[in-house]
A protein has these predicted regions:
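Conserved C-terminal structural/oligomerization subdomain of aldehyde/semialdehyde dehydrogenase
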Residues: 1-112
Length: 112
């Protein structure tokens, strides 16, 4: 887990794969959404909030194929798996895999 990482760091400008997370706080939800959508990648997103209003706003505005709010990823065979933008087109797993030309999103919100 990394914090106090400058925005110019590779982890904030590439799509990292591996056991690493760069944690960053934001004053305004709009700034967090803009930063999350800034790059051409959209595999998955994770957010932690006590606000159900913010959880729904993130679900509507984040450009990711899978969104996990207030929980770790919990993939299962019956759930869609896949990203948007340069992270993929369509999804694997679940009945959504049959509809390979759609951008299907998974949003899971656990009330905090």
């Amino acid at each position: 887990v990394l914090n106090d990482v400058p925005l110019s760091a590779r982890i904030f400008n590439e799509e990292p794969f591996g056991p690493v997370a760069a944690v960053r706080g934001f004053e305004k939800i709009e700034d967090a959404i803009a930063e999350a959508n800034r790059l051409p990648f959209g595999l998955a997103g994770y957010a932690f909030t006590t606000s159900l209003k913010y959880a729904h706003l993130l679900a509507q505005r984040l450009e990711v194929g899978m969104l996990w709010i207030n929980q770790a990823a919990a993939p299962a065979a019956e759930l869609p798996f896949g990203g948007l933008k340069d992270s993929g087109y369509g999804s694997e797993g679940g009945s959504e895999a049959v509809e390979a030309h759609l951008n299907t999103r998974l949003v899971s919100i656990m009330n905090a």
